[in-house]
A protein has these predicted regions:
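Terminal-proximal interaction/regulatory segments of ATP-powered molecular machines
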Residues: 337-349, 353-370, 375-383, 428-434
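Interfacial loop/beta elements and low-complexity acidic/Ser/Thr-rich segments
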Residues: 407-411
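Glycine- and Gly-Pro-enriched alpha-helical subdomains that act as flexible
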Residues: 317-324
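Conserved ASCE/P-loop NTPase catalytic core
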Residues: 2, 8-18, 27, 33-308, ...
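Conserved C-terminal helix/linker of AAA+ ATPases
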Residues: 43-55, 345, 366-406
Length: 434
């Protein structure tokens, strides 16, 4: 039976529950991963056939949903039947020869270990050592690897720095093109049961001399790429100038006059400023090369998408509807302490406004909530009464703490009122019946 996530719509549906907005980006990622999983399914029956894996570049500022996208994909890795792992580019170097840095190839140790976890979750450990090793290797070879801070390895700086970064990019290129890498030795201990004696014993399986092959792995690169929009806009402007020049040339810049002379050449007019579309502002291969990446490496990443900065409206929508929003997180924290937290719409708007002002995006929402509610949560520690906390927009603007309602006292008053009303009703009925 084909994996349901070979359907891109099913992947996007999962992303939609947590990552709000960014429709173009989510579609591109969902389609690429679905094709990757479909290729893995196809190779079970036709191992000789290979479809080129589409690697993806996600460009976007801090707090726009890039990391949240990874978290959602990570939750699905057992159903994907392949590891989904994120690594920070800055934690590694090309070969590990620079200032005792860790070589990038060591990421495959973690990939292989995670593949083993997935294998045992799905199939258990009843097979013999060779079968387990083969099964784990197949899962590892289909890994989806996300490399964060990808923009930080762009060629820049002094000669030594450029040399190191070029080495890094060359190493990465070899990985994407397809290469084999040795895995550090490790062991897996399993418990076996003797049916004759009903005794348990431990068996140690040595996983040694193992390799992973990156040919069928998928790579997703993430980065803010600060300033690349200027490169893209400059290119678009130059293209617009060229089109304007060509248009005017087609209308004969040197116009023939009735007297038989040529008039003065007309200057090429500056094109009017235009509002570029989302699709136009996706950096081209040439833009990324100009930013500082090797042409060969860029050519291996055919899918490029941009996560746009989140507006106040988008952040309010996230607070209200995302399953992992900062609002829901703080509601859980208060609930664990026996309290109820409510925010009015104006409060959510103020919180979103602060996050946008700081340039922190969705990532900054939790920080703003912490600043507003941490003291309240501390002061209420150990409180036995049932208290409702109301955070209002006008109180945030005025720098006031949230309102606290003693629900225990309110419940007591309501109960007493109910008893009184019931007693009065009973008395009236007795009088009317008599």
């Amino acid at each position: 039976m084909t994996n349901k996530f070979c359907n891109a719509k099913n992947i996007k549906a999962e992303l939609d529950s947590y990552v709000l907005g960014q429709e173009h980006g989510k579609r591109a990622i969902s389609m690429a991963i679905a094709q990757h999983l479909l290729q893995a399914e196809e190779q079970k029956w036709h191992p000789e056939e290979r479809i080129q894996t589409d690697n993806v570049l996600i460009i976007g500022p801090t707090g726009c949903g890039k990391t949240e996208t990874f978290r959602v994909l990570k939750k699905l890795e057992t159903e994907f039947k392949c590891p989904v792992m994120m690594f920070n580019s800055l934690d590694y170097s090309g070969t590990g020869s620079w200032r005792n840095t860790v070589p990038l190839s060591r990421i495959f140790d973690d990939v292989f270990l995670r593949a083993a976890d997935i294998y045992y979750e799905i199939y258990g450990d009843k097979a013999d050592a060779d079968e387990q090793k083969e099964g784990i290797t197949k899962i590892a070879n289909r890994a989806i690897i996300l490399l964060d801070e990808f923009d930080k390895i762009a060629l820049a700086g002094e000669d030594n720095g450029r040399l190191m970064l070029r080495e890094y990019q060359s190493t990465l290129l070899k990985m994407i093109e397809g290469n084999t890498y040795s895995i550090q030795d490790w062991t897996h201990t399993r418990t076996t049961n003797n049916a004759m004696t009903d005794e348990e014993s431990e068996e140690v399986l040595d996983i040694t001399e193992n390799e992973v092959d990156t040919t069928n792995m998928m790579f997703i690169f993430l980065g803010a790429f600060s300033g690349i929009e200027n490169i893209t806009r400059f290119r678009l402007h130059q293209e617009q100038l060229a089109k304007e020049h060509k248009r005017q040339s087609a209308h004969n810049i040197y116009q023939d006059t009735h007297l038989g002379f040529l008039s003065d050449p007309q200057a090429v007019t500056e094109p009017q400023p235009v509002e570029y579309t989302y699709e136009q502002l996706i950096p081209s291969q040439e833009d990324i090369i100009a930013y500082g990446f090797m042409r060969e490496l860029v050519g291996r990443v055919p899918i490029r998408t941009v996560y746009k900065p989140l507006s106040e409206d988008a952040l309010v929508n996230i607070l209200l509807h995302s399953k992992t929003s900062a609002y829901r997180e703080y509601q859980k924290r208060f609930r664990l302490n026996g309290f109820e937290l409510k925010c009015d719409r104006a409060a959510l708007r103020e919180i979103a406004h602060t996050a946008v002002k700081r340039g922190a995006g969705a990532r900054g929402l939790l920080t703003v909530f912490s600043e507003l509610l941490q003291d309240t949560l501390y002061e209420l520690s150990g409180e036995q009464r049932s208290i409702r906390i109301l955070l209002r927009g006008k109180d945030i603007k005025a720098g006031k703490p949230p309102l606290l309602h003693d629900r225990t006292r309110l419940l007591y008053k309501m109960t007493q009122l109910f008893i009184k009303q019931k007693s009065e009703t009973t008395t009236k009925r007795k009088r009317s019946s008599s």
